[in-house]
Swiss-Prot record:
Domain comment as written in the entry: Consists of two distinct domains, a catalytic core and a N-terminal extension that is involved in tRNA binding.
The protein's assembly and partners: Homodimer. The tRNA molecule binds across the dimer.
Stated name of the protein: Serine--tRNA ligase
Reaction(s) catalysed (UniProt annotation): tRNA(Ser) + L-serine + ATP = L-seryl-tRNA(Ser) + AMP + diphosphate + H(+); tRNA(Sec) + L-serine + ATP = L-seryl-tRNA(Sec) + AMP + diphosphate + H(+)
Top-level division of the source organism's lineage: Bacteria
Natural source organism: Campylobacter jejuni subsp. doylei (strain ATCC BAA-1458 / RM4099 / 269.97)
Length: 411
């Protein structure tokens, strides 16, 4: 959640940045009206309180005590009434603020959508083939690695069954990713895939993205859309010691998304599924540590791709493509020969203190004061999309898939 004091004190500057993130101008106008109303009602409340304090002190020496008591009683009623008005406005303001995204960093390019993201660099060269490379779903069906028909039969569209070496390769990737991330200093944790609403709120999924979540009927439980949610919230409501930071964690999980806005996109294959697997990185840091830790996380995910021999590129997301909780995001896109283009395989984001304010994660700084931490997250990596990338990049003209050297010991 945004710092409402900063929003109020720097309204024009902050709302300009929010507009670049495509926040509805009507919401921003409503915020301005609420701030003005709140200021007016708080001023009135302070005047009533000042009256009460002043004349309460004079009551003992007043000549007409009964008259003054009556005035104080009447004024107390006004204080109660005015306090209610202020509370109603504050609650309305906070409710609107819950649906307002994070402010983009200064370094984030201003743009409308993904077409205005900025390429930072390319890593490794895409492979060349003396034949037309196939897409992963063609390879997967011919090798009996991917069973889309039975996936749909037992579930619905956008579900798939992994079989034989395809399932083994997926499991090998999970183990390799966890080991790689641990070698970079990330502690392995295993968390629930079902979390409560407060946890979903803490990382920013609720209330704004409620319709894209799978919820358990009659219970305050949701299937996670990323393990960023439970890992970050492990420390919700806590005050950490300065010495423990940064906390760097990695986690494997299944992820569940309705993909409500993806009709017609990636309808074939396993690029976009309702259930998929991911190995995540999450860090909790002091504010002054978050930029360097962001670079560590980005380097970890990029080096992991390189260790598998997968060509990829770094993209800085523009304001219009930036996620709700993120202040800055760099995507990693892997080269897919079958599609002849780069596709997203990881997003590394710095959320600054946005999630920490919602989840109430603080630490005691060197001055002994409680301060909000910074939270960061990133995929290292999306398992299904890495499987896709290996299938397409390591295919031969006979339609066989060769296993990258780094993974051979995991079979």
């Amino acid at each position: 959640m945004l710092d409402l004091k900063n929003l109020q004190n720097n309204f024009d500057e902050v709302t300009k940045k929010l507009k670049s993130k495509k926040v509805d101008e009507n919401i921003l106008k409503k915020l301005a009206e609420l701030f003005a109303s709140l200021k007016k009602e708080k001023t009135a409340l302070e005047e009533f309180q000042a009256f009460q304090n002043k004349f309460s002190k004079e009551l003992a020496t007043a000549e007409d005590k009964e008259s003054l008591k009556a005035k104080l009683s009447e004024n107390k009623s006004k204080i109660n009434e005015q306090s209610t008005k202020v509370n109603v406005l504050e609650n309305e303001l906070e409710e609107i603020a819950h649906a307002i995204p994070n402010i983009p960093d200064e370094c984030v390019p201003v743009g409308e959508d993904e077409n205005e993201n900025v390429e930072l660099k390319k890593v490794l060269n895409p492979p060349s083939f003396d034949f037309t490379p196939k897409e992963h779903f063609e390879l997967g069906e011919s090798l009996n690695w991917l069973d889309f028909v039975r996936g749909v039969k037992i579930s619905q569209s956008r579900f798939c069954v992994l079989k034989n070496e395809g399932a083994l390769l997926s499991r090998a990737l999970v183990n390799y990713m966890i080991d790689f991330n641990r070698s970079r200093g990330f502690e392995f944790v295993n968390v629930p895939f079902l979390v409560n609403g407060a946890t979903m709120f803490g990382t920013g999924q609720l209330p704004k993205f409620k319709e894209d979540m799978y919820k358990v009927d009659d219970e305050d439980l949701y299937l996670i859309s990323t393990s960023e949610i439970p890992i970050t919230n492990l420390y919700s409501g806590e005050i950490l010691t300065s010495e423990t930071l940064p906390i760097k964690m990695t986690c494997y999980s299944a992820c569940f998304r309705k993909e409500a806005g993806s009709a017609g996109r990636d309808t074939r294959g396993i690029i976009r599924q309702h259930q998929f697997e991911k190995v995540e990185l999450v860090s909790i840091t002091k504010p002054e540590q978050s930029d360097s830790v962001f670079n560590e996380m980005l380097e970890c995910a990029s080096d992991l791709l390189s260790s598998l021999g997968l060509a990829h590129r770094h993209l800085m997301l523009c304001t219009g493509d930036l996620g709700f909780s993120a202040a800055k995001t760099v995507d990693l896109e892997v080269w897919l020969p079958g599609q002849n283009k780069y596709r997203e395989i990881s997003s590394v984001s710095n959320c600054r203190d946005f999630q920490a304010r919602r989840a109430k994660i603080r630490y005691k700084n060197e001055q002994g004061k409680n301060e909000l931490v910074h939270t960061l997250n990133g995929s290292s990596l999306a398992v299904g999309r890495t499987l896709v990338a290996i299938m397409e990049n390591y295919q031969d003209k006979e339609g066989k898939i060769h296993i990258p050297d780094a993974l051979k010991k995991y079979f």
